[in-house]
From Swiss-Prot:
Keywords: Cytoplasm, Glycosyltransferase, Purine salvage, Transferase
Protein name according to UniProt: Adenine phosphoribosyltransferase
NCBIfam families for this protein: apt (TIGR01090), PRK02304.1-3 (NF002634), PRK02304.1-5 (NF002636)
Family statement: Belongs to the purine/pyrimidine phosphoribosyltransferase family.
Task of the protein: Catalyzes a salvage reaction resulting in the formation of AMP, that is energically less costly than de novo synthesis.
Length: 186
C-alpha cells in the first residue's frame, strides 16, 4: 500500500475533473522529485475516457496509420488512443524486450545514455504516425522516438502527451515543424 501522506490530489470525479486525478508524489523516485502519478486517473473509467477524448480531439481528422506508444505508460495511453482514433498501435520499447530485428535509438540522460527500440518491419516506409507518451519532461525519450521514426522513414504527423512539465523545457528538444500537443501543462 502506498503511503499517501506523500500524495496530493482530490477524489472529485466528473467530466471536467480528470486533471484532479493526477496526483503529486513527493520525493519519488528520489528525494527532490515531485512525480506526476496518473494511476488514479487510469483507474477511474469516466475520467480516463474524458482525458483520452481530449488527447484524441486534435487528431480526429488527421489520417494516421499507427500510434507509436513509448514504454511504459505511453503503452497505456497510446493503445487506448489508437483505438479511439481507429488506427494501429506500435510499441516503442526498452532494449531487449522485442523479439526479432529492431531499430535502436540512443538518447542522453542526465548521467549516461539509454536506448529505445521498435521492430524494423513494424510499418511500411512513409506510414503516418502519431507519437504518444504520458509525460513530457526533459524531452529525451520523445526525441528518441522521433529518431526511430526517421530511421524507418515514417511521416510523424505529431506527438501527444497527457502532461507537460514546462519547467524542464523538454519542448525545446522537439522538432519545430512537427506539432507537439500536451493535454495538460504544469
Amino acid at each position: 500500500m502506498t503511503d499517501c501522506s506523500r500524495c496530493a490530489g482530490t477524489n472529485t470525479s466528473g467530466p471536467n475533473h480528470w486533471p484532479e486525478r493526477i496526483r503529486d508524489i513527493v520525493d519519488f523516485p528520489k528525494p527532490g522529485i515531485v512525480f506526476k502519478d496518473i494511476t488514479p486517473l487510469l483507474s477511474d473509467g469516466p475520467d480516463f475516457a474524458s482525458a483520452l477524448d481530449e488527447m484524441a480531439q486534435p487528431w480526429r481528422t488527421t489520417p494516421l496509420d499507427a500510434v507509436l506508444g513509448i514504454e511504459a505508460r505511453g503503452f497505456i495511453l497510446g493503445a487506448a488512443l489508437a483505438r479511439e482514433l481507429r488506427t494501429g498501435f506500435v510499441p516503442v520499447r526498452k532494449p531487449g524486450k522485442l523479439p526479432g530485428r529492431t531499430l535502436i535509438q540512443e538518447y542522453a540522460l542526465e548521467y549516461g545514455t539509454d536506448r529505445i527500440e521498435m521492430h524494423e518491419d513494424a510499418l511500411p516506409r512513409g506510414a503516418r504516425v502519431l507519437i504518444v507518451d504520458d509525460v513530457l519532461a526533459t524531452g529525451g525519450t520523445l526525441r528518441a522516438a522521433l529518431g526511430l521514426a526517421a530511421q524507418l522513414e515514417l511521416e510523424v504527423v505529431g506527438a501527444a502527451v497527457l502532461v507537460e512539465l514546462q519547467g524542464l523545457q523538454g519542448r525545446q528538444k522537439w522538432a519545430n515543424d512537427v506539432p507537439l500537443l500536451a493535454t495538460l501543462s504544469y
